[in-house]
Curated annotation (Swiss-Prot):
Known catalytic reactions: Exonucleolytic cleavage in either 5'- to 3'- or 3'- to 5'-direction to yield nucleoside 5'-phosphates
InterPro entries in UniProt: Exonuc_VII_L, Exonuc_VII_lsu_C, OB-fold_nuc-bd_dom
Enzyme class: hydrolase
Keywords carried by this UniProt record: Cytoplasm, Exonuclease, Hydrolase, Nuclease
EC number from the UniProt entry: 3.1.11.6
Subunit structure: Heterooligomer composed of large and small subunits.
GO biological process assignments: DNA catabolic process
Listed name of the protein: Exodeoxyribonuclease 7 large subunit
Role of this protein: Bidirectionally degrades single-stranded DNA into large acid-insoluble oligonucleotides, which are then degraded further into small acid-soluble oligonucleotides.
Name of the gene encoding the protein in the UniProt record: xseA
Presence of the UniProt keyword Hydrolase in the record: yes
Amino acid sequence: MTSYQPNLLVPPEVLSVKGLTDYIQTLLEDDSYLVQVWVEGEVSSAARHRSGFFFTLQDQQEAASIHCVIWNSYCDQLVIEPEVGEQILALGRIRVYPQRGQYQLMAWQLFPAGEGLRSLRYQQLRERLTREGLFDPLQKQALPTYPQTVGVVTSHQAAAWGDIKRTLKAQHPGLKVLFSPTKVQGKQAPEAIVLAIERVIKDGRAEVLIVARGGGATEDLACFNDERVVRAIAECPIPVISGIGHQRDETLADLVADVCAHTPTAAAECIPRLTDWQTDYRNCIARLYIILTRQLDVAHEHLLYQKTRLRRLQIDRQFEREQVLRSRLQNHLLHAIKHRLGQAQQHQQLLQQQLTSLDPTQVLKRGYALVQTTDQQIVRSTQQLQVDQELKVELAEGHFTARVTALQSSPQEADDER
């Protein structure tokens, strides 16, 4: 560094101490950056006086320190009070005191630094989004009855992706899965998660979306408390199931999701199954039978009551009329019950046929096979294949691996190529 060579000639006008101090005061107090500044440091001393708090902030390495004051008018609004040894974040402005030739930070508010600051920011964001209605249960979407395609947003390296694949394959044969990989940890994760969700929405095939990652430390899950991620889930046009962390973890993404499952496996289990729909249908039939039986019992009791009245009246003619009316009512009721039961049975048979036609295993049982490439692409044409390519062939019972030895196009494919 080149040393400064002062000009030793005394000018006609020199600054007074006040003039120099006023100049420094103007520089500091009128600086736009210092009008409202955030300062982080450790409280090295603190005292409460009638006029307010007086304390000193210093760096942990004690390389620098600054005197601070909080006047009484702000003390009742403080989030925390200054305590010696605490790492805090102070909001205030720089003031110069000419009498002492010192500058200090006139603070308005104090916040905990480090983990305390993260917790405070989380709570503030949660309260603001709650006021906006993002966590309102009435805004949540219902899951589709029997989805054919599900989107999954998670890391391809995470165990969560493996858990989801195994669960969906075991409980939902034939379900198509659209995987949109993303980072789920680090500073770049929030933006990556938003882009992954947008890819699924833009594709347009998924009927429900799973957003998941495995458990971890609180800071590892911070990306799922990011406002960008929370709003992306809230604005998603299809239902979202969150499976983030473990039971003890609760992120803002869990609160805004339509269904919160806490773990990736549980999130996959939330996808409605065909067997569940069949069970619901059987339960509906059972409830219908109970209702009709109760109606029949009520009608039977009414008939017995009318019969008793006729016996007490001992009027043959009126008894005959009541007897005829009872027979008509009984026949009408039995006819109505048979008709309703017949309709229910026909509806059940129709639904059973539809369910059977939707079951991919029924097609395989007729001698067909499902041929897939190693990356799980379904083979529909020889144009997708190459000689010596390895294929997975799934039958009604079991599967095996095959290798292409020769290719022969169908007449239609040959015409298309020409």
